[in-house]
Amino acid sequence: MLVSLGALRVLLGIFFTLTGAAKLFQVSAPVSQQMKALFEQFAEVFPLKVLGYQPDPISYQAAVGWLELLAGLLLVVGPPVLQQISNVLLILLMMGAVFTLVVLEESLSTYIPAVVCLGLLLLLDSCQFLVRTKGAVRCRNKIPGALGNPRK
């Protein structure tokens, strides 16, 4: 199970590193223009808009790109604590992406990548939690007097 969790973590990390880099660096002119147009739409329905904050689309794209790039890298090569933090940040980012697509009333096929990534990140998070708690709860040596067994 640990090998499959490691493989999932590395694959997700590489995926988010590449998508973050694509948002930050011009891959090609048509792709960059399409991404700019998308982030203009995304900025219009930004979740904190109800509180009076609406980001600049270019800054929004850069912030999401850096978050994906750094969190993806940390997911692959970071220490366990930073892997966990980056996983949580990516979960929050994907929840925001799904929210944005729902508000924009996009087609179902547009939701699929965000929902799949969110599901895989949640699976990784819950499995890592189970592995940590299973290791912490396991007691190899019986302690005399523990759990109601009187000492003799």
Swiss-Prot record:
A matching Pfam family: DoxX_2
Cystine pairs: none
GO cellular component, one term: membrane
Signal peptide feature range: 1-21
Source taxon at top rank: Eukaryota
PANTHER family membership: SPINAL CORD EXPRESSION PROTEIN 4, TRANSMEMBRANE PROTEIN 35B
Family: Belongs to the DoxX family.
Protein name per the record: Transmembrane protein 35B
Organism of derivation: Rattus norvegicus
Gene encoding the protein: Tmem35b
